UniProtKB/Swiss-Prot annotation:
The EVH2 domain is comprised of 3 regions. Block A is a thymosin-like domain required for G-actin binding. The KLKR motif within this block is essential for the G-actin binding and for actin polymerization. Block B is required for F-actin binding and subcellular location, and Block C for tetramerization. This is Protein enabled. The modification Phosphoserine is found at S905, S914, S924. It comes from Drosophila melanogaster (Fruit fly). It is found in: Cell projection, Lamellipodium; Cytoplasm, Cytoskeleton.
Length: 980
């Protein structure tokens, strides 16, 4: 009842309650003749008002009826409108049950003539093609009966036939047959007369079209040969037969049309449904379920991390776990390639419950409350992610920053942001396995990388970009260095391609190690990064083992670095190993033969550890170095020397490192051809290389390297004492490496252009991950940071150099402490730029702790401790690789290899281990061992006053750099707003 009223509502304009019949339904269905329910549906059937089976509407309920009262004579059914009347009055609206049927009926009538002309084809049984206008088909019996009278008739002209048929039909008008039969006959005659050759041979009834037979029947009677009686009888018989047959034909035709039109109607309905479904697919919630078909192909995971997803409860004023229970979840950022949108999706590791599924909107404020707890809000909730490790947190933060930059238009979004993709592959952390599509992309990238590497400069710049993005990921302590993509955003576009290449470097990877020297360097970088994504777990272990062996070899002989060189190529940390190797030779040359190899080992080991830890902080460093190296190859083959610079810092005099580089690189060149050429070309430019390496990470362009050389030039010019500052710089560079990850953002390139030191500071802020490498990592980072944060690194290094010159006797210690301090500053700056205020707090705490320890310990140990805290703060994620390397390895290898050897081996171990144990080692054992190792090569003479002065100076420099970074960020934001 309710539905009928609803259907009828719009059909009646009267809304007065008095006009509605409460006792009876508005729509009444008359069922007097229920036996013929289908008659009302027939397309061509004329439905009389009040015909059975039609829906009637009360006239009293229509305003139209009141305006124009009905004419009498409608009988008992005058109370209701017929469907035809409703159609005429335009009162049959779409809610009427028969509305759609009659809509279709109108369409069918409109196209009926067209269907007759085109769609009604003759049957296959007829040998001849009949006229276009066909009468309905008839059975053979009917045809024989029709042929009985005109069998003897001969064909006449069409005009005489027409006259005869008209006369005969006119005589039949008085016959008892209904008057409608005459109209049917006339229509048939018209159809028969219209063809040019309507005459048909009646002797072949079975072979002729029924329409032709009918026509011949109608006009084959010859008045000239037949008597009037014969003609009248023939005409009567013809009229009767034609009337009956045409009625039957009309029924059959109606059925055919009805069925065909129903079929068309159903097809059209299906098409409409499909059309609506396609439209609805974009807006329906059901089609957006996680893992749905639409998301599988359109969305790609750019980062994955383990974290507990929390939601802030305003009522309870506390954080509560999202979902039904607490526990770790796999949180991923998905990038929709087509819509260029991002969203965060988290599933419980235990039961795969979806605990977060929120969009990342433009302008989202991502707050890194602490090193491992990040939060943001949307229109409904305040989300918090409590990450299981700092590496995960930093990687995720970088991916989030990259997504926000892509959304804001600051970063060109290539095929999904290679950096992000790189993260997706490398960052995998066991969360995401390579798909066939990923493998194909990696293979394609590898082939591209192979072509690019042949050109030393072009590949270098690309590799630098790749390395830079990846260096941040490496710092995170996971091969996934997927964080690299977030790194230099200016470079991200190139990084996207190269990051994928690097991610693919599985193929790149082995070959590049032995590829062209200058190209090989970039390739190494690529290969380092690429393996991480595909083979992170196995490769990390394998690399760690190789690196450990390499470290031992390095400790035993100065040539060991070259082995590391090649092996690193084999491993993801190829480029880093090369750097390490070069550094090793430098240190060896600089330091006493026994001690020199050991310190190089530490430096190299640190670097190598970085490589071995490619997943860990060391890998980030190696990435930075690789990028630096690549940068250097463009400007100069200084890239190899960049690693050496850290070596000289440890070794002591910068000059010896270049020599060693020349020596060892040459000896090692065969092993790491890519690195060697650049090293050979600029053995004396270690400082420049290093600076350039610093600049390189900061910005892919060659210009970046030149600015670093000046700062390094000071160190190199200083002579052996300057090397100590370089060492400090080396220590400092790790912070830049940290910065390197974030620097990819616009800040890094400006820093590169303006001056490596300042630029790295700005970009460096985002990449805190690099610090994790530890002491060894710190020196390593020094270079990457210099690349990424040229300005900060150079300024801090200059200040440190001054301090070191004052205390040249203990350049290593001061250098290490400075480097640690520099790392801390860089890391802090980077984090601050990333908005990680917690990093500053953490650094302050570590500084206080280190100061307390330094007061208890000797000045040298204090410096070491200080260095560690800085590194620690900088490389919190990398502590395992860098710090642990120095701490744990320090105890094992430091005795034989010196501080750097121990750090190297330790780093290797830490790569496999979790960052926390490494941090502990770094904090406890590595400090003393590092101090001892540093003391072995150089005299340690730093008073507490000197340390305090150095600390104060570092703090001042940090503040200045932070202020600069803030100003740069503000300027960048202003320029962005002005652009819009």
């Amino acid at each position: 009842m309710a539905m009928k009223k609803l259907y009828a509502k719009t059909s009646f304009t009267s809304k007065k309650p008095s006009s509605a019949a409460n006792s009876t339904p508005i729509l009444a269905y008359h069922q007097q003749q229920h036996q013929q329910p289908g008659n009302g549906i027939c397309e061509f059937q004329v439905v009389a008002p009040g015909h059975s089976g039609e829906l009637m509407i009360r006239r009293s309920q229509s305003m139209h009826h009141k305006m124009s009262p009905p004419v009498g004579g409608l009988g008992s059914k005058s109370e209701y409108y017929s469907i035809e009347e409703l159609q005429e009055l335009d009162l049959l609206d779409y809610r009427h049950p028969m509305y759609h049927h009659y809509q279709q009926q109108e369409l069918r009538q409109r196209y009926h003539e067209h269907e007759q002309l085109v769609l009604q084809l003759p049957k296959a049984t007829s040998p001849k093609a009949g006229p276009i206008y066909e009468a309905p088909q008839r059975s053979q019996q009917q045809q024989d009966q029709m042929l009985y009278v005109p069998t003897a008739a001969q064909r006449d002209s069409s005009s005489s036939a027409a006259a005869t048929s008209i006369a005969s039909s006119s005589t039949l008008t008085s016959s008892p047959s209904p008057s409608s039969s005459s109209s049917l006959i006339f229509s048939t005659l018209r159809k028969c007369v219209s063809p040019s050759n309507p005459s048909v041979n009646p002797n072949q009834p079975s072979k002729t079209q029924p329409s032709k037979l009918g026509c011949s029947m109608s006009f084959s009677i010859r008045t000239t040969t037949a008597t009037a009686a014969t003609a009248a009888a023939a005409n009567a018989a013809t009229a009767t037969l034609s009337t009956q047959q045409q009625q039957q034909q009309a029924q059959q035709q109606h059925k055919q049309h009805l069925y065909s039109n129903i079929h068309h109607y159903l097809i059209r309905q299906q098409q409409q449904k499909q059309h609506y479904t396609l439209q609805r697919r974009h807006n329906s919630v059901k089609d957006k379920f996680i893992g749905g078909i639409t998301t599988i192909f359109a969305e790609q995971s750019i980062i994955g991390a383990r974290a507990s997803v929390m939601v802030y409860d305003d009522n309870q004023k506390k954080w509560v776990p999202s979902g039904s229970s607490s526990g770790l979840s796999k949180v991923q950022i998905y990038h929709h390639q087509q819509n260029n949108t991002f969203r965060v999706v988290g599933r419980k590791l235990q039961d795969h419950e979806v605990v977060i599924n929120c969009s990342i909107l433009k302008g989202l404020k991502y707050n890194q409350a602490t090193a491992t707890f990040h939060q943001w809000r949307d229109s409904k909730f305040v989300y918090g992610l409590n990450f299981s490790s700092q590496n995960d947190a930093e990687n995720f933060a970088r991916a989030m920053m990259h997504a926000l930059e892509v959304l804001s238009g600051r970063v060109a979004n290539n095929p999904g942001g290679p950096p992000t993709n790189g993260n997706g592959y490398e960052e995998d952390m066991g969360y995401r396995t390579m798909t066939s599509e990923d493998a194909a992309i990696l293979r394609q990238n590898n082939s591209i990388g192979g072509h690019v590497t042949p050109s030393a400069q072009t590949p270098t710049s690309q590799t630098n970009q790749n390395n830079i993005p990846q260096s941040p990921p490496t710092p995170q302590g996971h091969h996934r260095t997927s964080s690299a993509p977030p790194a230099p955003q200016p470079q991200q576009q190139q990084q996207q391609q190269q990051a994928q290449q690097m991610g693919q470097p599985g193929s790149h990877y082995g070959p590049t190690g032995n590829g062209p020297t200058s190209n090989g360097l970039p390739q190494q970088v690529n290969s380092q990064i690429p393996p991480a994504p595909q083979q992170q777990p196995q490769q990390q272990q394998f690399q760690q083992q190789q690196q450990q062996q390499q470290y031992q070899q390095m400790v035993q002989a100065g040539y060991a670095p070259s082995q590391q060189y090649q092996q690193p190529h084999y491993v993801l940390s190829n480029s880093n190993p090369n750097l390490t190797v070069h550094q090793y030779p430098t240190q060896q040359a600089q330091q006493q033969p026994p001690q020199a190899p050991q310190p190089p080992l530490q430096n190299g080991g640190m670097y190598m550890v970085g490589h071995g830890h490619l997943p860990s902080s060391a890998s980030a460093n190696s990435v930075v170095y690789a990028s630096q190296q690549q940068m250097l190859p463009q400007a100069h083959p200084q890239a190899p020397q960049a690693p050496t610079m850290p070596g000289p810092g440890y070794g002591g005099p910068p000059v010896p490192p270049p020599q060693q580089q020349a020596e060892n690189p040459y000896g090692q060149v065969p092993m790491p051809p890519p690195m060697n050429p650049s090293q050979q070309q600029q053995p004396g430019q270690v400082p420049l290389n290093r600076m350039s390496s610093q600049g390189g990470p900061g910005g892919p362009p060659a210009p970046a390297p030149p600015p670093p050389p000046p700062s390094f030039g000071g160190a190199a010019g200083g002579g052996p004492p300057p090397p100590a500052p370089p060492q400090m710089f080396n220590g400092a560079p790790p912070p830049p490496a940290m910065g390197g990850g974030p620097p990819p953002a616009p800040p890094a390139p400006p820093a590169m252009g303006g001056g490596p030191p300042p630029a790295p500071g700005g970009p460096g802020a985002p990449p805190p991950p690099p610090p994790p490498p530890g002491l060894g990592g710190a020196p390593k980072k020094e270079d990457p940071q210099a690349d990424l944060m040229g300005s900060l690194a150079s300024q801090l290094q200059q200040i440190k150099l001054k301090k070191n010159k004052v205390t040249t006797s203990a350049p290593e210690n001061s250098g290490s402490s400075t480097s640690s301090g520099g790392s801390g500053n860089y890391g802090t700056i980077g984090r601050s730029s990333n908005g990680m205020a917690s990093m500053m707090d953490e650094m302050a705490k570590t500084l206080a702790r280190r100061r307390a320890q330094a007061e208890k310990k000797d000045p040298d140990p204090e410096a070491e401790v200080k260095k560690r805290p800085w590194e620690k703060s900088n490389t919190l994620p990398h502590k395992l690789s860098g710090g642990a390397g120095s701490g744990s390895a320090g105890s094992g290898h430091e005795g034989a290899n010196g501080n750097s050897g121990g750090a190297g081996s330790n780093t290797t171990n830490s790569g496999g281990e979790s960052p926390r144990p490494m941090r502990k080692r770094f904090g406890s054992a590595s400090e003393e061992t590092i101090l001892k190792v540093n003391g072995d090569g150089l005299s340690l003479a730093l008073s507490n006053g000197d340390l305090d002065t150095l600390k104060a100076e570092i703090v001042r420099e940090m503040r200045l750099e932070i202020q600069k970074v803030k100003n740069e960020i503000i300027d960048a934001i202003k320029s962005e707003f002005n652009r819009r």
